[in-house]
Amino acid sequence: MAVTRFGKSGAPKMKDKSGTLLIAERGGALSQNLDFWITEQGHRLKTVDNLKGLLMTLQSEKINVLVMDVRLPEDMGYEAISIIKGLDRKLPIIITADENNPEQESRIRQQGIFYYHVNSFGMDDLILAISNAMVRSSQ
């Protein structure tokens, strides 16, 4: 069972198995913001900046949680989530978006994602979602 502790970053520190977090985004801002927390948790961080790299990584490595920017899948849109689920149906997928668009959120949630994160909600919500997804993936 996971026990919540608070690390130096002030974010929850989960006592669970370490895992690998894959962040799929352009620009790398999210991975830079999460790097300290991920290291503090004992997790590994992998990053990709395109759909091809994402799919290749999922086929070749054990990934515990995927955090993907909603804009990453280029022309594939929501179909990309179905393809990812086809590779690993139990993979917790967290989608990040800059704006809260209810129609987009509804379509994405129908794909069976773990969490839909609007960036303006702040990093604490995202960190909590990643922590919960890591716990789920280790069960």
Regions found by a protein language model. Name each.
Residues 1-37, 124-139:
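Non-catalytic signal-transmission and effector/linker regions of two-component phosphorelay proteins
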Residues 47-65:
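Acidic, metal-coordinating helix/loop segments flanking the phosphotransfer/catalytic sites
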Residues 50, 76-79:
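Acidic catalytic/metal-coordinating carboxylates
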Residues 66-70, 97:
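Active-site residues of response regulator receiver
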Residues 73:
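The feature encodes the CheY-like receiver
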Residues 78-89:
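Short amphipathic alpha-helix used as the core "switch/output" element in two-component signaling
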Residues 79, 99-117:
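Alpha4 helix (beta4-alpha4-beta5 surface) of REC/receiver domains from two-component response regulators
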Residues 90-102:
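A short, hydrophobic beta-strand element within the central beta-sheet of small alpha/beta folds
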